[in-house]
């Protein structure tokens, strides 16, 4: 069994650790309102030498991008639409998840200091 671990490094980096590789995602503000720039780096345990190995990692890289663009982002947009559907509603997010609470406290603190 393989485990995928997602680690958020405040404020804008996400590490996704797989059995044989690590993805490093950087999320930065774009030049316009509501624009974001995202970069992805993929690091493998072993250097890809053969054409087959290079194709394998190129395919993994493209798969990661496709999943984020075609699945994760649309899902996130739909969730946000739901949040805005009833702005008077109280929302409890991560009540029993200290990691999420700490992350949001860190964001709030950084915004106060900025």
Language model: regions and residue ranges:
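C-terminal catalytic domain of Rieske-type non-heme iron oxygenases
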Residues: 1-114
């Amino acid at each position: 069994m393989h485990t995928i671990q997602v680690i958020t490094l405040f404020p804008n980096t996400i590490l996704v650790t797989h059995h044989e590789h690590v993805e490093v995602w950087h999320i930065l503000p774009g030049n316009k309102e509501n624009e974001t720039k995202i970069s992805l780096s993929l690091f493998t345990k072993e250097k890809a030498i053969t054409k087959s190995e290079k194709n394998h990692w190129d395919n993994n890289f493209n798969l990661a991008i496709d999943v984020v663009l075609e699945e994760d982002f649309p899902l996130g947009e739909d969730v946000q639409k739901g949040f805005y559907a009833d702005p008077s509603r109280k929302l409890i997010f991560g009540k029993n998840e200290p990691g999420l609470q700490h992350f949001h406290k860190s964001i709030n603190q950084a915004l106060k200091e900025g």
